């Protein structure tokens, strides 16, 4: 509580945590005499940080979005796996979300298949610059080359890069698209 009281505002992840902090009271005693000096209790605001989803936006009833429909028309496969997340720094299979490992596993699982699904990577390294897009495409190609060399694969499944910011409604349309 002493640390929390030094903050202007403390954010917690649940109402339970907020209530525990708000209801916590400790007696402060002199270590030598044991005499009660006062009480330690919450003096600063604590708020719950919403970490859920907005069901008014993310649901199966939402209409399709033109931008998503246009992107998905370019995907020839009837089914695609979707990955959404940042592809952060790190060597092969050492990046935080192991996107490189995901790609490696996907390619190895569906190599040389006549009716392989696609993989849609809705990713960036934290920005949507052209430099970032080119770098990510290069990393995907490096992994494809490594899989071909290691396994002598003659055919690899398609990977599509969706490298842009999307609105919540566009994301919902992507999650609910029939190909995903």
Task: Go through each PLM region and give its residues.
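Membrane-proximal helix-turn-helix segments that form the acceptor-binding/catalytic region
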Residues: 1-10, 36
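A short helix-to-beta-strand connector/capping loop
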Residues: 6-7, 40-46, 149-160
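Carbohydrate-associated surface elements
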Residues: 16, 52
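P-loop/Walker A phosphate-binding loop and immediately adjacent motor/lid segment at beta-alpha junctions
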Residues: 24-50
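Conserved catalytic-core segment of nucleotide-activated headgroup transferases in glycan assembly
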Residues: 55-169, 173-177
């Amino acid at each position: 509580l002493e640390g929390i009281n030094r903050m202007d505002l403390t954010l917690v992840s649940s109402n339970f945590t907020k209530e525990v902090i708000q209801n916590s009271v400790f007696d402060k005693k002199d270590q030598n005499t044991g005499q009660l000096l006062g009480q330690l209790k919450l003096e600063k605001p604590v708020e719950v940080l919403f970490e859920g989803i907005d069901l008014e936006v993310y649901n199966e009833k939402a209409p399709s979005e033109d931008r998503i429909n246009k992107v998905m028309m370019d995907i020839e496969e009837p089914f695609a796996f979707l990955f959404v997340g940042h592809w952060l720094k790190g060597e092969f299979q050492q990046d935080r979300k192991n996107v490189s490992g995901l790609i490696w596993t996907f390619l190895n699982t569906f190599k040389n298949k006549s009716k392989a699904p696609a993989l849609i990577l809705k990713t960036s390294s934290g920005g949507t610059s052209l430099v970032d897009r080119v770098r990510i495409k290069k990393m995907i190609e490096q992994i494809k080359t490594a899989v071909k060399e290691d396994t002598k694969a003659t055919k690899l499944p398609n990977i599509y890069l969706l490298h842009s910011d999307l609105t919540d409604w566009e994301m919902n349309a992507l999650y609910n698209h029939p190909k995903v």
